[in-house]
């Protein structure tokens, strides 16, 4: 069939993940199509909107390549309902689609590592058995580490199971509440939030601002939980540290499972970058990937944004993304991070991680593990701060900058010859960038 041939052509131009998650779900609607218009059915409005925005023009072009005529391409979700049971399912899906779910966020494209494995497994279990023992699920951790990705993965999984899913930020919950209060329509508000199968609240920490919001959310939580509705929340801190919240809410947040996400290890960051490149069909060599992973800190959103900007600049300049090219394009980003880092920051992290007193690192002790820690600090200070070698030498009361060069040389030799040592230094660098 011509439509299948066109989609097969499209698969060669996009990443395998994009094809699998979006294009493969399209069904050619032969009855609704004509010579001028080609119609595809998508499983839901979210996917239809996404494909229409990103791929419709490309699909039309490929039809033109095959036939010599460029048709209009329509992506729709309209299907004939064969039974009242099917009708009920579709009504559920339509209700669920008034959410913030992004179909790009799935469990399949979430990169799992030691820093997020427990949160990942908890979210997956909550999706597979909603309203059971993982209820509520409270995922917490610093900004940009993947909490929203997991939250929306729960939503997309449950949506595909025919569940009614409501996914909002705490700000949208508050805006919705205020609007319905002012318009005397709280019955509609409660119908929406208390009769869903799955309620997802992103950044729940902001709900502690007013007593009225807390009161409403308290009753929403109770009613949903009593009906075995699944509740998943994300926050930047664990429940007992939430400010402004009543104890009765904090206690309820702890009823189910609390799962934290911590900054990713270096190998997890590398895997995340590789996954992003695979999804967006961006080629970065190993050196560039390692450079980004070790210099961009832990905020995944910032890392992904940096990759997109780097690729866009390379395309505009028609340049290959070499390590030197990446360093040049990203120099301002890296410089900004380095300006926030000083020697005290580095000593604080290194002393804590290597279990050596800061005063020992600053001393002239020749004990082997202290010497090594001091050399690591010097190496990282040259790499991560704006300090010159004479300034570093002065800080450690060394004769001149040649002593700094000697210490850096020793660390470079160890990095080149000892993979475990190299990994340890990279992890230290990673923690400093995050803290800085």
Curated annotation (Swiss-Prot):
Entry GO terms, CC: cytoplasm; plasma membrane
Region described as Domain II: 69-99
Tagged with keyword DNA-binding: yes
Residues noted as binding ATP in the record, renumbered to the chain: 144, 146-148
Broad class of the protein's primary localization: cytoplasm
CDD domains found in the cross-reference section: AAA, Bac_DnaA_C
Localization: Cytoplasm
Molecular function terms from GO: ATP binding; ATP hydrolysis activity; DNA replication origin binding; lipid binding
InterPro entries referenced in this protein's UniProt entry, alphabetically: AAA+_ATPase, Chromosome_initiator_DnaA, Chromosome_initiator_DnaA-like, Chromosome_initiator_DnaA_CS, DnaA_C, DnaA_dom, DnaA_N_dom, DnaA_N_sf
Family assignment from sequence similarity: Belongs to the DnaA family.
Family matches, as PANTHER family: CHROMOSOMAL REPLICATION INITIATOR PROTEIN DNAA (PTHR30050:SF2)
SUBUNIT field: Oligomerizes as a right-handed, spiral filament on DNA at oriC.
Protein name (Swiss-Prot/TrEMBL): Chromosomal replication initiator protein DnaA
Species, as recorded: Campylobacter curvus (strain 525.92)
Gene this chain is encoded by: dnaA
